[in-house]
């Protein structure tokens, strides 16, 4: 007898006896498998019927993808369901009892209140109704996920039913907002279980999710600072990421760890208003200076001290950091136009015109005299709104640098006359190591040498101003927005955002994953997951293409569905998921992204490790 004729008879028997409907393709495959297992011994029709039914009881209906429930049942507010429907129970919970009490009972922890109170709990009166059990079932026909509520007590059901149990619901069943109201006359137990669901829908795990308790799979979020922040997820279920302040702090800390150890950490003081800064005593200066920590800037001429031969000894990461520092200095060259000067005296902020002048390795020397701000070579008119003047504070006792070296044209020599007799002067200084200032004559007046460390200053009130640098406040990334989007080996996210492309643009960036913003899911036969990436200059929401996720997991969606039928092989898929999770967490590489400006998000098309070719491209870009 052919497999097709046997399948037709089995299909008729399943429908007539159990009201079970299955796809013909699955039925024929099941019959072939049963015959192979029995060495092609001719089985009677009754034996074949029984074995097929047993296999159906152990099958996950989601793999069959055979619709039974009417379409639109979830969208209909209320109605009645008529007929016979063989459904699968994924999980069930007794909603009449607190979930916390149930999970404590499962764990064998006795936390009843009468053990720690003076009085026992109030005994219910005889006439008071006892609380009745109410099970809430998560049901599926393989396509539609629907809930079933134990509207009246159903003896056939209990909370210890294994996930994947099959039941038959029949008769007239009312439903409200996607919930079937089940009664004893509507439910018949068929049995069965699904091994693949035993772990995912274990009773303890289901209750733990209800009370918001995390699943016991721990992962970490990289913050690029050698610190580990534990994050607890369910496979690839994302948790709340760190705050913006923590992310920015972590990026700053990473720069400090990866940069040269010879470069000291500076603290800067800004002339301007800030709600988060502390003013210096006004007796020291007529202008109010406020202290605010900021990320250390790498001196320009320090980065230029390295020759091409020395760059060969650098690691790739150090070379990338060096490139970023150079880009920051180029940004100051192109974008520096404004300077903010806020004074606490009654004088209003004056506007100054300037002549352009290139000052190499400049520093700000402050000396008590008349309150004149004298400078030569003035160019460009400066307002006091968007730029801030910053100088390292004398309060930083451990700072080993008294001048911030810049090899950029600086348009600021300015004069501000006030009531006191202090003179502020900017002069050009040549220093081989950037840590000392020589005695020089400037405008006929001797300017005293500034000690290397603030602890060497005999009178703090007379030497509060040290070397100062100019900080651009408009663009916190410090990167040139005019940078070519296709400059090899990569560009910066901030440059991409600032260029405001009108159409979909494909570029390369060197970035890492800050956090996953969505679950790993499969739809239409492809994997998908959403994440937020950063390169230290900006953040961007991205999706990953199926090819990347398939390579990380090791299995495609279709392969995963086949593996789910075999518990032994399915374990390999779970291991692949964990491997994918670890690699996404540690991911920091070159990403080819397709940026869609209308959606303000991108698609990651390819991943590539940094290699020596990229280092050579960086060298060439440095020489331009």
UniProtKB/Swiss-Prot annotation:
Family classification: Belongs to the RMI1 family.
A Pfam family name for this chain? RMI1_N_N
- UniProt KW keywords: Acetylation, DNA replication, Isopeptide bond, Nucleus, Phosphoprotein, Ubl conjugation
At what positions is N-acetylmethionine found?
Answer: 1
Sites of Phosphoserine modification: 225, 292
Where's it mainly located?
nucleus
Q: Which InterPro entries match?
A: RMI1_C, RMI1_N, RMI1_N_C_sf, RMI1_N_N_sf, RMI1_OB
Q: What segment(s) does the record annotate as region Disordered?
A: 378-422
Q: Provide the species name.
A: Bos taurus (Bovine)
Location(s) in or outside the cell: Nucleus
* A GO MF label: nucleotide binding
Stated name of the protein: RecQ-mediated genome instability protein 1
Quaternary arrangement and interactors, per the entry? Answer: Component of the RMI complex, containing at least TOP3A, RMI1 and RMI2. The RMI complex interacts with BLM. Directly interacts with RMI2 and TOP3A. May bind DHJ. Interacts (via N-terminal region) with BLM; the interaction is direct.
Glycyl lysine isopeptide (Lys-Gly) (interchain with G-Cter in SUMO2): where is this cross-link?
Answer: 334, 387, 425
Q: Where is the composition biased (Polar residues)?
A: 390-406
């Amino acid at each position: 007898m052919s497999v097709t004729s046997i399948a037709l008879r089995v299909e008729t028997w399943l429908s007539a006896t159990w009201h079970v409907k299955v796809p013909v393709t699955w039925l024929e495959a099941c019959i072939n498998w049963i015959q192979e297992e029995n060495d092609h011994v001719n089985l009677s029709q009754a034996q074949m019927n029984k074995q097929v039914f047993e296999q159906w009881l152990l099958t996950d209906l989601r793999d069959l993808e055979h619709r039974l429930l009417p379409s639109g049942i979830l969208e209909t507010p209320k109605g009645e369901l008529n007929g016979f429907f063989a459904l699968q129970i994924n999980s069930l919970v007794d909603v009449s009892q607190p979930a916390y009490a149930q999970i404590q009972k499962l764990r064998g922890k006795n936390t009843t209140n009468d053990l720690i109170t003076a009085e026992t709990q109030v005994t219910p009166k005889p006439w008071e109704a006892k609380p009745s059990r109410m099970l809430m079932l998560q049901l599926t026909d393989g396509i539609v996920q629907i809930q079933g509520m134990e509207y009246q007590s159903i003896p056939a059901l209990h909370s210890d039913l294994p996930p994947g149990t099959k039941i038959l619901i029949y008769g007239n069943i009312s439903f409200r907002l996607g919930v079937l109201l089940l009664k004893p006359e509507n439910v018949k137990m068929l049995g069965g279980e699904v091994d693949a669901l035993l772990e995912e829908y274990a009773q303890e795990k289901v209750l733990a999710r209800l009370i918001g308790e995390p699943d016991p799979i721990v992962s970490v979020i990289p913050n690029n600072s050698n610190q580990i922040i534990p994050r607890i997820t369910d496979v690839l279920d994302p948790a709340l990421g760190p705050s913006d302040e923590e992310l920015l702090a972590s990026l700053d800390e990473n720069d400090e760890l990866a940069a040269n150890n010879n470069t000291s950490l500076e603290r800067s003081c800004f002339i301007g208003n800030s709600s988060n800064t502390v003013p210096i005593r006004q007796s020291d200066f007529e202008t109010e200076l406020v202290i605010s920590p900021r990320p250390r800037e790498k001196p320009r001429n320090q980065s230029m001290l390295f020759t091409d031969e020395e760059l060969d000894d650098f690691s790739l990461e150090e070379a990338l950091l060096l490139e970023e520092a150079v880009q920051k200095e180029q940004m100051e060259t192109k974008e520096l136009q404004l300077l903010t000067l806020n004074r606490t005296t009654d004088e209003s902020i004056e506007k100054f015109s300037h002549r352009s002048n290139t000052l190499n390795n400049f520093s700000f020397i402050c000396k008590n005299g008349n309150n004149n701000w004298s400078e030569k070579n003035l160019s460009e008119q400066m307002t006091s709104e968007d730029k801030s003047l910053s100088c390292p504070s004398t309060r930083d006792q451990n700072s080993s640098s008294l001048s911030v070296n810049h090899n950029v044209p600086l348009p600021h020599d300015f004069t501000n006359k006030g009531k006191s007799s202090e003179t502020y002067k900017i002069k050009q200084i040549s220093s081989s190591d950037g840590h000392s200032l020589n005695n020089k004559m400037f405008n006929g007046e001797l300017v005293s040498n500034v000690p290397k460390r603030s602890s060497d200053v005999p009178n703090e009130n007379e030497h509060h101003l040290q070397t100062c640098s100019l900080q651009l406040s408009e663009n916190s990334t410090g990167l040139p927005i005019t940078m070519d989007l296709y400059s090899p080996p990569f560009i910066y996210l901030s440059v991409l955002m600032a260029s405001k492309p009108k159409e979909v643009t494909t570029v390369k960036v060197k970035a890492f994953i800050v956090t996953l913003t969505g679950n790993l899911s499969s739809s239409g036969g492809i994997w998908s997951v959403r994440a937020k990436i950063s390169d230290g200059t900006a953040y961007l929401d991205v999706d990953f293409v199926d090819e990347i996720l398939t390579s990380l997991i090791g299995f495609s969606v279709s392969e995963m569905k086949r593996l789910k039928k075999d518990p032994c092989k399915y374990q390999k898929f779970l291991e692949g998921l964990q491997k994918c999770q670890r690699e996404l967490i540690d991911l920091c590489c070159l990403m080819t992204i397709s940026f869609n400006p209308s959606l303000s998000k991108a698609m990651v098309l390819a991943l590539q490790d940094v290699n020596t070719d990229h280092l050579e491209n960086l060298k060439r870009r440095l020489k331009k």
